[in-house]
């Protein structure tokens, strides 16, 4: 697998694939994917690849039927390459970390769109237990949730341009603070209830991560 940041054409290809297989349950675009991956990398507990790969599509029932193994493999490779690059920036070069916000041209001006990234981040938050986040850092999570939850839509719409800009500027530092805290205070995974035999994927069943490979052969296990 290649390393380093994805180039523009690779990001556009990921965007095209997310659009191609989009449903009401899946993430919308590469900005939302970036937000999800940032939250996964900042999680209190380790999140397995098959968990977040399924979350990309909104659940196991919505994992795409890939047009070809080549298409599936390229999607996986680019997603993991982007994740590795983001992890390196968060861990080693936080000054280089920049959320992959969207851009939209309105009346000749280019506007920064943070909603998709924040929705992706909150989708990633939902994959683990953040309940032990200290009160001192709850404003950081709220800074992202402000733009990443439907319940805050009305609040955002009523903000002045100045307040909106301030809220956008707060997202990057909030993500860095949350990542730094959980890396310094990792949490143990909760003990899971035993899975019934009939509910557990068989060794020859398709892996739930969507790779298309058998569970016993999947490169993610």
From Swiss-Prot:
Gene3D superfamilies: YgfB uncharacterised protein family UPF0149, PF03695. One of its GO terms (molecular function) is iron ion binding. Coiled coil: none annotated. InterPro entries: SEC_C_motif, YgfB-like, YgfB-like_sf. It holds the Pfam family UPF0149. It comes from the Bacteria. NCBIfam families: PRK10396.1, ygfB_yecA. This is Uncharacterized protein YecA. The lineage of its organism: Bacteria, Pseudomonadati, Pseudomonadota, Gammaproteobacteria, Enterobacterales.
């Amino acid at each position: 697998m290649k390393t380093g940041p994805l180039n523009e054409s690779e990001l556009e290809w990921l965007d095209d694939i997310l659009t191609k297989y989009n449903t009401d349950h899946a993430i919308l675009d590469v900005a939302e994917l970036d937000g999800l991956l940032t939250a996964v990398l900042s999680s209190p507990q380790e999140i397995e690849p098959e968990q977040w790969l399924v979350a990309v599509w909104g659940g196991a029932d919505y994992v795409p039927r890939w047009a070809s193994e080549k298409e599936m493999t390229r999607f996986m490779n680019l997603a993991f390459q982007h994740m590795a690059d983001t992890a390196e920036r968060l861990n080693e070069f936080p000054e280089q970390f920049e959320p992959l916000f969207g851009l939209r041209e309105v009346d000749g001006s280019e506007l920064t769109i943070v909603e998709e990234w924040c929705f992706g981040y909150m989708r990633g938050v939902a994959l683990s237990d953040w309940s032990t986040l200290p009160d001192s850092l709850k404003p950081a999570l709220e800074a992202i949730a402000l733009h990443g939850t439907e319940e805050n839509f009305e609040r955002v719409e009523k903000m002045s341009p100045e307040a909106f800009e301030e809220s956008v500027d707060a997202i990057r530092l909030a993500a860095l603070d949350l990542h730094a805290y959980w890396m310094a205070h990792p949490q143990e995974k909760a003990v899971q209830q035993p899975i019934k035999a009939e509910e557990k994927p068989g060794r020859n069943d398709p892996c739930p991560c969507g790779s298309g490979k058998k569970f016993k052969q999947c490169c993610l296990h």
